Amino acid sequence: MEIVSDKKISEKGIASAAELLYKGAKMLAHSCPECKMPLFEKDGKIFCPSCGREVVIEEDSAAKAESEEKPPESTKPAVKADYDEAVEKIEMAISKVCDMMVESRSVEEVRVLSDSLEKLVDALKKLRE
């Protein structure tokens, strides 16, 4: 597991990500260039749930040309990799929320974190079904 940034992912960002997964948004393998939170896609838009920034992902021209020349291979391994990455990111978020709950001194904060944790666990269960 690689830590991409020293910045702490905000509680609001985690709750927002959990809610998006619950509502059917797709977590992407790319992260926000600003806050390093995983990007999400919903209704054809790619955005960061933490900072609300809409993002455009560009392929480099060499990779694009190569993909146009090659006939499409089976997408099963790519789908499996995306699935595994989504599961791993949700598990990381669950771990971070648990750590935040342990460190919390506020009952209200624990309640909010508990709600976020419940949504993340539900999303993980749905992915594994």
UniProtKB/Swiss-Prot annotation:
Positions of region (Disordered): 61-80
Pfam name, any one: Auto_anti-p27
Disulfide bonds: none
Top-level taxon: Archaea
InterPro entries documented for this protein: SSSCA1, UPF0148, UPF0148_domain
UniProt family annotation: Belongs to the UPF0148 family.
HAMAP family named among the record's database cross-references: UPF0148
Protein name: UPF0148 protein AF_2370
Organism of provenance: Archaeoglobus fulgidus (strain ATCC 49558 / DSM 4304 / JCM 9628 / NBRC 100126 / VC-16)
